[in-house]
Amino acid sequence: MYFSSYQNLRKRLLSREISCETVVLDYLERIRKNHERNVYITVFNDQALQRAKELDRKLEAGEQPGRLFGLPMAVKDNLSVKDASLTCASKILEGYTAVYNATAVERLLKEDAVFLGKVNMDEFAMGSSNENSAFGPVPNPYDDSRVPGGSSGGSAAAVAGDLAMVALGSDTGGSVRQPAGFCNVVGLKPTYGRISRYGLVAFGSSFDQIGILSRNCDDAALVLGVIAGKDAADTTSSQHVVPDYLSEMGSVSLKGMKIGVPEEYFPETLDPGVALAVRNRLEELRDAGAELVDIALPESDHAIAAYYILTTAEASSNLARFDGARYGYRSGDASDLSGMYVNSRSEGFGGEVKRRIMLGTYVLSAGYYDTYYKKAQQVRRVFLDRYKEALAKVDVIAGPTSPFPPFGIGDKMDEPLEMYLADVFTVPASIAGLPALSVPAGFDRSGLPVGLQLIGDFFDEGKLLGIAREIQRSQEE
């Protein structure tokens, strides 16, 4: 059973050509058959089936179906789903069960979505390959020997492998967009504050944003329209009006549109296959009437350094709560309270998380605060100013999502700096808080997916999705 889009599925559900129960059973069976792919950490077998039956009864009773009636979804395992385990793919949250729903989850449930389970990720969303997971890596659906990207690798692999129609992820510096590019799906990181972070386990609080992964732009737009908007439980959520994103997408015209192409996004070190695929898509946009404008963003070289200083500083504070005293993993090898704290954290956190906690603690220390943290905050301001200046001249900014195609499992685990460079093109939009998405741009000569990234002005998600839809359509013709 395959559906090209949620709208196609919805039409068949509402006409009663098929039932929610049938659809959910089909997805659960595929998940069971693909268990060895390690995409799901927790599968909601009984809960999803019960939910599907309730929705079928609702339709039979003549009640109004929700906007996402019967949509089969996966949730990254750093989002709270009430009464379900919440692991963040970490040993330190062993045995923890969420006691409430994240706001995004609650809003989706109110519109009749169905959650199939919680998917794998890099531990506490720290990573670019999904290898930093206490539950093991996830293979790329296009090549089992390669990574799906991260940290939302399970979300991307679930959608690409047809183990969910849409998945929620989180994006701190590229964690939705980079795996979307690696897995040939759409990955949207909205404007910071567009979606409530209530119920999302924090990594870098001033960067984190819940994102959406889907096969097509229409599905992403429908989900965004449901979960976007102000939330009293999250003071950083925006009051900006939530538009009809499908309508905004429909009003997008490529004729005369100015698309900024930064020279910094096409360095000599860029993988040739990535460069070719992205250039081809940009030329198609030109052929459709858009104007490609060369722009310069010279501060881009400082993006990775500023990002890792700021996010690790926030992470060192956010992760201090995981100490073994109140919930999760507690070491049995300690003679006093201090020893219990130290051993629980040493044994419970993985290597990459400990590396970032130590880095964050270092840059916040008295002797280095001004040298590193304060300077990185100043660089962040410069980034915002430069991108605002660029977006005053062009409608969107375009370039590759990642500098290289999916790499082999284990290839970069011993080289953290090389791993960090996977996000070199996605980090700037996160630093500035701007909306950005990755859309499939084709494949390299080895048949590996390539993503094209679009960056827009604040709250321009509809425009980005509209352009991305045209890019997808051009490849289908």
Swiss-Prot record:
Keyword Protein biosynthesis in the entry? The reply is yes
Q: In which domain of life is the source organism classified?
A: Bacteria
Q: Which residues form the active site?
A: K76 (charge relay system), S151 (charge relay system), S175 (acyl-ester intermediate)
Q: Its Gene Ontology molecular function terms?
A: ATP binding; glutaminyl-tRNA synthase (glutamine-hydrolyzing) activity
Q: Show the Gene3D superfamilies listed in the entry.
A: Amidase signature (AS) domain
Note whether Protein biosynthesis occurs among the keywords.
Answer: yes
Its EC number is 6.3.5.7
Q: Which reaction does it catalyse?
A: L-glutamyl-tRNA(Gln) + L-glutamine + ATP + H2O = L-glutaminyl-tRNA(Gln) + L-glutamate + ADP + phosphate + H(+)
Could you give a single Gene Ontology term from the biological process aspect? translation
GO CC field: glutamyl-tRNA(Gln) amidotransferase complex
Instruction: For this UniProt record, give its keywords in alphabetical order, as a comma-separated list.
Output: ATP-binding, Ligase, Nucleotide-binding, Protein biosynthesis
Role played: Allows the formation of correctly charged Gln-tRNA(Gln) through the transamidation of misacylated Glu-tRNA(Gln) in organisms which lack glutaminyl-tRNA synthetase. The reaction takes place in the presence of glutamine and ATP through an activated gamma-phospho-Glu-tRNA(Gln).
Its quaternary organisation is: Heterotrimer of A, B and C subunits.
What name goes with this protein? Glutamyl-tRNA(Gln) amidotransferase subunit A
Origin species, per record, is: Chlorobium phaeobacteroides (strain BS1)
